[in-house]
Amino acid sequence: MLNNYVTSKAEIAKELNLSMPTVLANVNDLLEKKVLEETGEYASTGGRKAKSIGINKSYCHAMGILITANHIEMVLVNLGDEIIKKDRIRLKFTAELSYCTEVAQKVKTFLEGELAKDTLLGIGVAIPGIIDQKERIVLKSHALGIENYSLRFLEQALEIPVYFENDANAAMLAEKKQKYPNAIYLSLNHTLGGAFCIDGKLFRGQNQKAGEFGHMILVPGGRKCYCGKSGCADAYCAASVLTQDNRQSLDAFMEKIESGDEKVLQTWNEYLDHLAVLISNLRMAYDMDIILGGDVGGVLSDYMIPLGEKVMAYNGFEHDVSYLKNCSYKKEASAVGAAKYFFTKHMGEL
């Protein structure tokens, strides 16, 4: 139901290979709990019209937060994955306790008067870094400048169930599992992150580092990366390559492309060249769909043809790039994905 939103009892029985009495019993139970609701009727083919049923989007909500070096991004999401409120506030990250208190206050203000407290399942917090979820520790975050940083103070300050996730992993969670059960997510933000799922589940690796595509060597001996190595994909494919480390906005850069600025067009063409190499390598290694997300992913939909042509030039085994997908959320993907964790958890407990 979370994937389809609206369906019928007969379709559920067919999809799940269940008997109609079993489906009726479970659907009626969920209708009684107000998780589901009747949404209308199907056109009659003779006899009584079948009722359509769907998720009651207002049954519960979850909040998502993305923490960056200079901002926090907040969203409130309903059970239909719809963003019903969002805000982005400038707040410089510090490792001090006062930061946790300030975030908690911003959350309280954001939620004030929005919904009944008992419908809020929890807060998902997306962080750019490697996270030990069991111990509630950020093992390392170059973006925030922290190492072995405890998240328990922030958890206590929020006073609501909290889930912590790497920002790229969270963005992957924002995508529908049914649509992309096996996929790579390239998070083309200020820094380059990544994630991938297998059979609808995030693959984390032995040390929580799976999907760190930004630190694969793309150009041996090339540009210096913030991690200390040279030639990392991040130094060639992150949004910062286009924004000159935030000296200009991505929107301003794209406007210059539209106006035909030759220098900007050259930078963009080189960027797509390097991105095409990275995509080709990932496709050869994983043989799955590749979702283009993050700030740059949000604007790539208008440039899929030139990007696809460059990718095909590096891949002699395939003659199309239908595996390249645009992200579902051009903005707020990490915050939404972190929030959606609570829907999956809650539905599993019903």
Regions found by a protein language model. Give the residues of each.
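Adenine-nucleotide phosphate-binding core of ATP-dependent small-molecule kinases
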Residues: S98-A116, A233-Y236, T243-Y303, N326-S334
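Glycine-rich phosphate-binding/hydrolytic loop that grips phosphoryl groups
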Residues: L2, Y163-Q178, D302-L350
